[in-house]
């Protein structure tokens, strides 16, 4: 599972955790997140997220 970070506000989407508040179940891969999904903190789209490594 990977993590993706919003380049605008820094929010991190963790594929292992998903985003249940937004209707995205745990284990949902980034490519399976709907294309029209927006960052819940700043409102940008998926194109403004970059894959990151944490650790």
Curated annotation (Swiss-Prot):
Positions with a binding annotation for Fe cation: 6, 9, 39, 42
Name used for this protein in its record: Rubredoxin-1
Induction and repression of expression: Constitutively expressed.
Entry function: Involved in the hydrocarbon hydroxylating system, which transfers electrons from NADH to rubredoxin reductase and then through rubredoxin to alkane 1 monooxygenase.
Assigned keywords, A-Z: Cytoplasm, Electron transport, Iron, Metal-binding, Transport
Gene Ontology terms for molecular function: electron transfer activity; iron ion binding
Origin organism lineage: Bacteria, Pseudomonadati, Pseudomonadota, Gammaproteobacteria, Pseudomonadales
The keyword Cell wall biogenesis/degradation is annotated on this UniProt entry: no
Gene3D superfamilies: 2.20.28.10
Keyword Glycoprotein on entry: no
Cofactors: Fe(3+)
């Amino acid at each position: 599972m990977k993590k993706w970070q919003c380049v605008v506000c820094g929010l991190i989407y963790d594929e292992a955790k998903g985003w249940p508040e937004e209707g995205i179940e745990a284990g949902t891969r980034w490519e399976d997140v709907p294309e029209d999904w927006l960052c819940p903190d700043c409102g940008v789209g998926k194109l403004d997220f970059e894959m990151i490594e944490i650790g």
